[in-house]
């Protein structure tokens, strides 16, 4: 269409060649100088230029072409461009000014309206995505468009109710993940909050839902009161069961073995058992077997007499067993104790007597032992032979499992607020004790490999960064937590590919020709043929 016929028509875009701002004047001047004065500059050319400029800046700054590093660098950054400032939001989309232009006889556009402020992208749902059965379309819609950029819950199910995809909001609400089978009661629960439901002719279902009158979907604490065992509080049913066992164990002198990942709070639970026991007025002595050199563990545990070895203290020294007399000895990382010392430890537990290194005198002790490890001691016994079975069964009167923090999502809010309160007091009343819903949602979506110890460190960092703010916001959290939801599980991709293959096979069975099958699937005949070769679908499948 020539300028004569285009004149008077309107167009909406972020960029027009006639845009009168310094960045565009410089850009247009450079383009005409390089490609000629008659060059017409389109928005595609301007966008390409801006994109290359942003990526180049990232590469120069990072001195790396790693895709993930570049994406992380670009998040939440604002760049000047021929169309004005462009901001790359954390959801991968751009926000920038939008304008409406009216074409004139010169082939240019007169700007008749401008938003005058950045407009964020908001991808819209179409009605053809799911029915197309095309992997790229499904993946683009579910993961890139709606998955993690919305506070609404997004679920994709196959015809057997197996979850092919669940975003963090769906996980927070229903505690489900990819590969789980959605239960009927869970389906009823979301049916009252449905925003959109799509079902393809081959049974793939999409649900978009939200909870009424709430902001971001969070792991909400149950209505009942939390279970309290001393200083330990939980809303988690599994952990509550373990704490009830710990409460019973605290009223006896029986040995306790605490199992849990690093940073899950094993020593805190051991101290709580001691504080709730009849031995509460006695000493609580802790020893980490994994943090002491092998040659020193024996002297730390059992003590030594003067002259027992080179460098021995004059007058000797009592070991941890003697120091803990009348109280509790906590042996952390018991799985790291050298095999040769496990015999001596077993003897002390059985006889309730200790012999210092270099001595022959038996000293009676009255000690309750609580051991802890992050290892699977049964495997250490059965497959590696690095832990004695008789010692294991001596320690294992009561076994208490501490669930990892990733399985205690409902406790994250309580723990975070308690840490904030502690830091508020530690820093003499400075800082905030409040956590925004958006920040809490990110905390609940993160996997927490370092468990409670990592959470405490993250909260302390956020507290200090937000020292003058009214509440903790997502910007105060580390990048790995802010970007945690951007990670795409490989298994989800594989499941979607399996669904695509099954859909193609089903369509071929129900069709009389490739053309008919392609039409049912919403793809071209050539694309279908390529997919048949890609998935190695046998021709016998086609009727």
UniProtKB/Swiss-Prot annotation:
**pH dependence remark:** Optimum pH is 7.7.
E.C. no: 1.14.14.51, 1.14.14.52, 1.1.1.243, 1.1.1.144
- Official protein name in the record: Limonene hydroxylase
Q: Name one GO molecular function term.
A: ATP hydrolysis activity
> What SMART domains would the database entry show?
AAA (SM00382)
> Do you know which CDD domains this protein is assigned to?
AAA
Keyword terms: ATP-binding, DNA-binding, FAD, Flavoprotein, NAD, NADP, Nucleotide-binding, Oxidoreductase, Transcription, Transcription regulation
Q: How does activity depend on temperature?
A: Optimum temperature is 45 degrees Celsius.
Q: Which SUPFAM superfamilies match?
A: Homeodomain-like (SSF46689), P-loop containing nucleoside triphosphate hydrolases (SSF52540), Periplasmic binding protein-like I (SSF53822)
Domain annotation Sigma-54 factor interaction: ranges: 232-464
- Record has Ligase as a keyword: no
Q: Where does ATP bind?
A: 260-267, 324-333
Q: Which InterPro entries match?
A: AAA+_ATPase, Homeodomain-like_sf, HTH_Fis, P-loop_NTPase, PAS, Peripla_BP_I, Sigma_54_int, Sigma_54_int_dom_ATP-bd_1
Spell out the note in the miscellaneous section: Oxygen, FAD, and NADH stimulate the hydroxylation reaction, while NAD(+) stimulates the dehydrogenase reaction.
The entry's function note states: Involved in limonene hydroxylation to a mixture of carveol and perillyl alcohol as well as in dehydrogenation of these products to carvone and perillyl aldehyde. Aromatic alcohols containing an isopropyl or isopropenyl group at ring position 4 also served as substrates for the dehydrogenase activity.
Q: Record's PROSITE patterns?
A: SIGMA54_INTERACT_1, SIGMA54_INTERACT_2, SIGMA54_INTERACT_3, SIGMA54_INTERACT_4
Q: Which reaction does it catalyse?
A: (4S)-limonene + reduced [NADPH--hemoprotein reductase] + O2 = (1S,5R)-carveol + oxidized [NADPH--hemoprotein reductase] + H2O + H(+); (4S)-limonene + reduced [NADPH--hemoprotein reductase] + O2 = (4S)-perillyl alcohol + oxidized [NADPH--hemoprotein reductase] + H2O + H(+); perillyl alcohol + NAD(+) = perillyl aldehyde + NADH + H(+); (1S,5R)-carveol + NADP(+) = (R)-carvone + NADPH + H(+)
**GO terms of biological process kind:** regulation of DNA-templated transcription
Q: Which organism is it from?
A: Geobacillus stearothermophilus (Bacillus stearothermophilus)
